[in-house]
Structures are given as C-alpha cells and as structure tokens.
Amino acid sequence: MKTLLKNARELKGLKTREVAQLLGIDQALISKFESGTRKPTREQVVKLASLLEIDLETIMVVWLKEKILYEIGEDEFALKALLVAEEEIRYQSKPSKKKLSTTLQKILDEIDTLKTKLDGFRQFDSYRIAQALELEYTFESNRIEGNTMTLRETDLVINEGLTISGKSMREHLEVINHQEAIAYIKDLMQRNSSINEREVLSIHNLILRGIHPEDAGRYRKVQVMIQGSSHMPPQPFLVAKEMENFFIWYETNKSILHPIVLAAEIHERLVTIHPFIDGNGRTSRLVMNLILLQHGYIIANIKGDYDSRMQYYQALETAQTKNNKEDFLLFIAQMEKESLERYLNIIGQ
C-alpha cells in the first residue's frame, strides 16, 4: 500500500502537502500512509484512488489484504481460518448477474444486433454526422432542464459563436458548457479512463462553469428537493458516503452487467443521490453516455419534448420511490435502440 501510494503521488508530481490539501486531511496522515505506520480508512482509500488515478479495484485489494494480515497474520490458525472464510466470502459477496425480464432481454438483443451492423460501417463514420448528432444531444439534454433555445439557435451559438437575442446568459452558457462536456467524455473514452470521483466532478464542473462557479465540481452542502418528485435525496452530510458507495458499486458491477444496463443503473443511481446543487440530470446523462461510448455504443439521446420528458421522469420516479427499475432500464434501452436506428438510417443502412 505504502509503495503504491508513494509511486502514484510522485508520478502525478504532487507533494504530500498538496495531496493533503486536496483531500482535506492532515499532511502528517499522508506521510504515515506512505511510511506504513498508519492505514487509511476505506473512504480515504476511495478518495486517494480518485485523486492519484489508481485503479480502485487494485488499491482496494491491497488495502483489504493488509487489513487481513494486520488482524490475523501472525495467528497460528490464520491460514485455516482464511480457507474457511474464503468459501463464505465467495457465497456472500460474489456479485450475481441479475436475471433480466424477457422484454428487456429482447430489446438488448435487438440493440446488439444493430451495434454489430453499425460496427461493420465504422470506417464510414463521418465527423459531420457525429457533430450533428452531438448538437442534437446538447439541444435535447438542455431542453429537458428547461432551456428554451431551439435546435437552430443551439447550432448558431456553438458553431457560429452568435448571441441569441431574448435568450439569457445562462442559456447560452448551458449550450456551450454541454458541448464542451461532450468533448470531454469523448476524450475520456479515447483514453479509456475509469469512471471515478475526479472525472464525475470534472464533468459537473464543465456543466456549471460560469453559471454557479462556487458549486461547479463540488458536492452540495445543503438539502435539495426535486420539483415534481416525491423522492427526497440524501442529506448533504451523507452525500460523500453515498458517492463512495456509488463508485464501489460501479467497480463491482462494471464487468458483470450488460453495458446498457450498467449505463442506465449508473444514470439512475447518480441522479437519485442528487449530489450537486444543480446540473444533476445533465451530469448523470453524460456519465451514462460515457459508459455507452466506452463499450462501443453511441450516445443515447433522451428527447426533451413533453411526452418524452414525462416518460423519463415517471420511469425515474418509479425507480426511486418503488425500487422498481424495470421501466427505467427499458426506457434507456429504447433510447439507445432508437439512436442506433437513426444513425444507421443516416448512413443509408
């Protein structure tokens, strides 16, 4: 653990003092972590992994190994105890692949057929097509949140740098910021970056840049309510812990779930925590689409018209208040299917 932390810190070019400031803990603790005289807590391990860009699974395995050795390493019955515990751990904690409904499995199969077809035409991918679809995504995602820019106005702001008369500065910034956030997740996809706290906060920072600079890229410090929803997000003092669990859940399930289900689950879990004062919906949709892009799918564009918006909100509400995610998983799967069909139609296939 100590070598892993020190090497990662030095690779990032950070001093122990800088790491301590970024994590909000005492510098002496960082030195003790690196010397091996003190072990970080689970929460500190998650934060260190995010800050120093260490694979969460790798560092958690090292942390747990050292924790086990500290507790029972010198006991004469340690090895026997571990052998007995191994089977229990396998039984209790091995993530199981959740059985999907027949309806959901059918649409996932249809999506994968469409993706396979699209994969055969990847060499014909057009920058102009991608640019047009990303523009539509920015338009629709902002429209969901109440932005009144039309698709044409969104285009003029992004590609012509124009100011639209009668539209607020916030609406202009929402358009510009979202388009830059799309570029950012595409860069993360190209670099095969892991989804961690740092990247989620960076996406959110882009979304609120110039709109709420004091809240951009930071977890909320106040309680919030979701207008029109009976779901009550967690209290602000619980947000950091909920987000820690969020990232652990992702690491545990990222290799188990179908990518569409994983992306939809991450979307729902993040927006349910509602970790930010504003920009939760856009950030959640961007993180969802980052996962889809990483697995070779295309952006799932949720429409912002009234009917689509109500279907989206109702599916979310059911997931949040009744712990029934079927409607939401089906909704996201349908959005991805429609996006794939449209893309294939555009390229004439």
Q: At which residue positions do the language-model features occur?
A:
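DNA major-groove recognition helix of helix-turn-helix/homeodomain DNA-binding modules
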Residues: 43-58
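Conserved short acidic donor-positioning loop in nucleotide-sugar-dependent glycosyltransferases
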Residues: 62
